[in-house]
Amino acid sequence: MFFLPVCTCCRYYCDYCDTYLTHDSPSVRKTHCNGRKHKENVKFYYQKWMEEQAQNLIDATTAAFKAGKIQSSQYQNKPISGAMIPPPAALQPGPPQRMPLVGPPHMGPMPGPMPGPMPGPMPMMGHPGPMPPNMMMPGDSFFPAPKHVH
C-alpha cells in the first residue's frame, strides 16, 4: 500500500488516488481500497508502469543493436525456400480417404455406424515465396508501442 502519514492529525495520503483519507483507521483504508475509483487508479498506475518498462526495454534493445552488441536475427537476409507443405488429404484428387475403423489386433472392424461425410476442404494457407514487408519472421519478438494516455 502507498499510504503515507502526512501529519499527526490522523490523515493518510493515497498515492494511487492523489487524495487524503480522513482517518487513520483500518476500516477507512479498507473501504477506500475496495472502492471502484481506487481500483481503477491502481490498475492505471501499474499499466502505465508496464508500458514504461516495455518502452525502456525497446530503447535499450535498439541502442544495443545500433552499438553492434546484438546481431541481426538468424532468419534475416536468408531467402525463403520454395518448399511447400503438401495439401491435406481432403484437397487431393480422388475419392475421400478414410482411416479404417479397426479395433485391437485380431478383432476386425469396430461395430457401430460409420461417421458422417468428410468435412469440406480446408482453406489454403497462402502462397510460398518471400514475406511481404513489415511481416515478422520466426524468432522475432514483438513489443507493441505503448499507448500514451493523457
Swiss-Prot record:
Cellular localisation:
Nucleus
Primary localization: nucleus
Q: Does the keyword Zinc apply?
A: yes
Query: What's a single GO MF annotation on this record?
Result: zinc ion binding
Task: Give GO BP annotations, semicolon-separated.
Answer: mRNA 5'-splice site recognition; spliceosomal snRNP assembly
Checking InterPro entries in the record gives:
Matrin/U1-C_Znf_C2H2, Matrin/U1-like-C_Znf_C2H2, U1-CZ_Znf_C2H2, U1_snRNP-C, Znf_C2H2_sf
Give the Matrin-type zinc finger regions: 12-44
PANTHER family, per the entry? U1 SMALL NUCLEAR RIBONUCLEOPROTEIN C
Protein name, per record: U1 small nuclear ribonucleoprotein C
Q: Which organism is it from?
A: Ixodes scapularis (Black-legged tick)
